[in-house]
Amino acid sequence: MFKHETVLLHETVDMLEVKPDGIYVDATLGGAGHSEYLLNKLNEKGHLFAFDQDQTAIDNAKIKLADYSDKVTFIKANFRDMKEALNERGIEAVDGILYDLGVSSPQLDERERGFSYHQDAALDMRMDQEQELTAKTVVNEWSYQDLIRIFFQYGEEKFSKQIAREIERRREVKPIETTGELVDIIKTAIPAPARRKGGHPGKRTFQAIRIAVNDELGAVEDSLEKALTLLKPGGRISVITFHSLEDRITKQLFQEATKGPDLPPGLPVIPDEYKPDFKLATRKPIVPSEEELEQNNRARSAKLRVIEKIIK
């Protein structure tokens, strides 16, 4: 069964200031926790469009949200294609959009998906099972330099060179097929003192490969840029991030959007066209409460940022 602890459930949806008759988007359906809470706030005129590129997530959400079937439309697509998918359905603007950028726990926990460094499985890591690029391709075919780049940039891994070198050495003997083999390579490459602290030694490398396979950071940037253009005045976007790379992208995009164009010097009054279109609804990111952290350890690194389109 598709189980997923929803992080910052109330905060994320409540910060959207949901209108009962509004049109909303859940860009990351996952376990449908946020969607369910949001649908509860809509009347018969309100509607939710829920996106996921994982068919399993959609199939399970259809069962979970069966009572709301007339108020929700499920769309199997990467959220970077959200604007086009909504436009195709006649939707040009929406009242709110939410993102939960954590990988759904079921995807991490399903052995055959190849995300987990705790269980041996084929190297896969695709969110969209119809996509061609897999973790096996990255590990066996990407150059030494590209592996260093993704391990360092996406995993913030100190031992990127050592791990890439060991991968290169092993794959010359035979292809690297499984997550277990990759974990063994990582453990060989990382010096013993470093292996003993900071959680599982494979954590950063696996994160880096997953981000690369799914082009996660590129998709986040594309999607958020389009999301800003979809908002009605007064509408809001809530974004939960789980690591510094996504948070940096979100923070920079939001700051850029709230700046407004450069002003000519010496203006006594700022004309409307020079006023920014957006304002931050959260000066500092909202983080989970101690109570939530006790119940769900995966929420530890979560940060929620919210932006609002200004009514002019």
Curated annotation (Swiss-Prot):
One annotated GO molecular function: rRNA (cytosine-N4-)-methyltransferase activity
Annotated Pfam families: Methyltransf_5
Keyword Cytoplasm: yes
GO biological process terms on file: rRNA base methylation
SUPFAM superfamilies: Putative methyltransferase TM0872, insert domain, S-adenosyl-L-methionine-dependent methyltransferases
Reactions accelerated catalytically: cytidine(1402) in 16S rRNA + S-adenosyl-L-methionine = N(4)-methylcytidine(1402) in 16S rRNA + S-adenosyl-L-homocysteine + H(+)
Binding site for S-adenosyl-L-methionine: 32-34, 52, 79, 100, 107
Subcellular location: Cytoplasm
Keywords: Cytoplasm, Methyltransferase, rRNA processing, S-adenosyl-L-methionine, Transferase
HAMAP family: 16SrRNA_methyltr_H
Protein's recorded name: Ribosomal RNA small subunit methyltransferase H
Annotated organism of origin: Listeria monocytogenes serotype 4a (strain HCC23)
